[in-house]
Amino acid sequence: MIEALQDLGHQIEAKRPECVLSWDIAHGELNIDVKPANIAGLVEFLRVDSACRFSTLVDITAVDYPERTKRFDVVYHLLSMYQNQRIRLRAAVREEDMVPSIVDVHPSANWFEREVFDMFGILFTGHPDLRRLLTDYGFRGHPLRKDFPTTGYTEVRYDEAQKRVVYEPVKLVQEYRQFDFMSPWEGAEYILPGDEKEIAK
């Protein structure tokens, strides 16, 4: 299996060198790092090439790396039922970059790209209807970004007196604690109640 994926990686790199930045194999799947501008062309090639035949788009998602200059990885998961292989394409983009849509190659990408836009704020050029999919029309921010507050900005509830849905600022029962997610986690300096292991030392 690994040998077949290695052969496939070499073939794709040889046939489309302008698209492939690098590739590796992890968890039984071929991972290819792609230039964002070339993603649509590479996906089309992978669909029609007889050695590939990745005709099924399984998913499009993104990963947020706030410490990087190219903050997001847009990740495409493709399946070849003919070759019984999976492939993962990764395109690293800055926050303000736009990624070409692949709706013309895989119509099912329509909702996947809308979800990525809604959750991460990544824009897709050439998308026929790029609007929010999972959040409300007036929603502020993008919930899967790591800098989005866990409480959100507003809460929604039905007001019986007004007979309509109302938006209100978030009111917390306890004071909001801001955590620095970029720092390594450190435990308490003191022994916690009920921690018999520490007392036995």
Curated annotation (Swiss-Prot):
Pfam families assigned to the protein according to its UniProt record, in alphabetical order: Complex1_30kDa (PF00329)
Compartments in which it is found: Cell inner membrane
InterPro entries on file: NADH_DH_suC, NADH_quin_OxRdtase_su_C/D-like, NADH_UbQ_OxRdtase_30kDa_su, NADH_UbQ_OxRdtase_CS
Primary location class: membrane
Membrane topology: Peripheral membrane protein
Keywords for this protein: Cell inner membrane, Cell membrane, Membrane, NAD, Quinone, Translocase, Transport, Ubiquinone
Keyword NAD: yes
Disulfide bonds listed in the record: none
GO cellular component: plasma membrane
GO MF entry, a single one: NADH:ubiquinone reductase (non-electrogenic) activity
Enzyme class: translocase
Reactions listed under catalytic activity: a quinone + NADH + 5 H(+)(in) = a quinol + NAD(+) + 4 H(+)(out)
EC number(s) on file: 7.1.1.-
Keyword check for Transmembrane helix: no
Entry function: NDH-1 shuttles electrons from NADH, via FMN and iron-sulfur (Fe-S) centers, to quinones in the respiratory chain. The immediate electron acceptor for the enzyme in this species is believed to be ubiquinone. Couples the redox reaction to proton translocation (for every two electrons transferred, four hydrogen ions are translocated across the cytoplasmic membrane), and thus conserves the redox energy in a proton gradient.
Subunit structure: NDH-1 is composed of 14 different subunits. Subunits NuoB, C, D, E, F, and G constitute the peripheral sector of the complex.
Family note: Belongs to the complex I 30 kDa subunit family.
Name the UniProt record assigns to this protein: NADH-quinone oxidoreductase subunit C
Lineage, uppermost ranks: Bacteria, Pseudomonadati, Pseudomonadota, Alphaproteobacteria, Rhodobacterales
